[in-house]
Amino acid sequence: LLIDMDQSGVETKPIKLISGNSPFCETFFTDAIVPKKNLVHKLNKGWDVAKNLLQHERKMLASMGLGGSKAASKGKTGSGLATLSKKYVEVKEDKIVDEGLRQKIAKCDMNAHAFSLTLKRASEEAKNSNHGPSAATSIFKLYGSEHNKQKYEIMLEAMGTQGLGWEGGEFGPEELAITREWLRTKANSIEGGTSEVQLNVISKRVLDLPQ
């Protein structure tokens, strides 16, 4: 059912997350009445609608580590990891001295670029076939979740103790924002279906493996 959030009997209360943001809320229905015309699809076919919504959500979530779906579709996948890291680690001739960190940044950026091209290709194929997102979105969502978490892990590694702040004058606004966003990335492998659920979907609906 499509429900008017401003109608009588519907109340929402924000849920503040550890990141400090409130993208989620509790919704309370008290004697709320919704007209039958607001029914989406057919009666008792809500799961069909929900599954399609989940596929769209997973496609959107897949690109979050690339700066969002618009940035990914345009190939703008620069992570800014090198620029950020140079503020905190030893640099010689404009190159990060720590070879291990350099390799992590290079791998993350290359993976991001390859992933963005894959998302773009899949999006174009979906448009040309006149079909919506397929079960393959579970692959994108699974990888996108892990990629985003890895990216912020590298940021905190480069920042050292400056990446451990929660509040206080010794930490800058950008540092505090990155730390909170790092905490937020832990939810990436939960929202839109957990990584374990995605692996099940991939095995059954993409790879057609026996149960």
Which residues does each predicted region cover?
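Alpha-helical interface subdomain recognition
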Residues: 55-211
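FAD-binding core of flavoproteins
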Residues: 1-86, 204, 209-211
